Amino acid sequence: MIYRLKKNIEFIIVYRRGKSFANKTLVLYVLKNKRNKDKDGIAYSKVGISVSKKVGNSVVRSKCKRLLSESFRLNYNNILKGYDCVFVARNPIRDSNYFETEKAMKNLIKKAGLYYDEENGIKSN
């Protein structure tokens, strides 16, 4: 299950206290959150997605959000748990397809040091 950042205050906290990483199409804000634990005490990560009106009309923005959500969902098992992540879409994302979006997302997650290769048990930096 993918947990979401929903409230404005959650986004603000990540923006202010988190660390940012950027590439051409995305900006990633990351904040370690020790309170992200389920009933069994297992840590999980939360994600928030922000797409500005500068990117395009509502159809384009929704498409971008769907692409980012799906990329995160499919790579969730390879991301270290216990973090709040906010992805902010930049203008060039409107012209990118799923594979380019996923590549940009993985690139930022690796830059942040959150990518964990399950097969090899290796944390990428």
Swiss-Prot record:
Please indicate which superkingdom the organism of origin belongs to.
Answer: Bacteria
Name any one Pfam family assigned in the record. Ribonuclease_P
Any S-S bridges, and between which cysteines? none
- Output the InterPro entries linked to this UniProt entry: Ribosomal_Su5_D2-typ_SF, Ribsml_uS5_D2-typ_fold_subgr, RNase_P
- Single GO cellular component term: ribonuclease P complex
Catalysed conversion reaction: Endonucleolytic cleavage of RNA, removing 5'-extranucleotides from tRNA precursor
Q: Which UniProt keywords apply?
A: Endonuclease, Hydrolase, Nuclease, RNA-binding, tRNA processing
> Its family?
Belongs to the RnpA family.
Question: Could you tell me what this protein does?
Answer: RNaseP catalyzes the removal of the 5'-leader sequence from pre-tRNA to produce the mature 5'-terminus. It can also cleave other RNA substrates such as 4.5S RNA. The protein component plays an auxiliary but essential role in vivo by binding to the 5'-leader sequence and broadening the substrate specificity of the ribozyme.
Subunit and interaction comment: Consists of a catalytic RNA component (M1 or rnpB) and a protein subunit.
Q: What is this protein called?
A: Ribonuclease P protein component
Which organism encodes this protein? Answer: Clostridium botulinum (strain Eklund 17B / Type B)
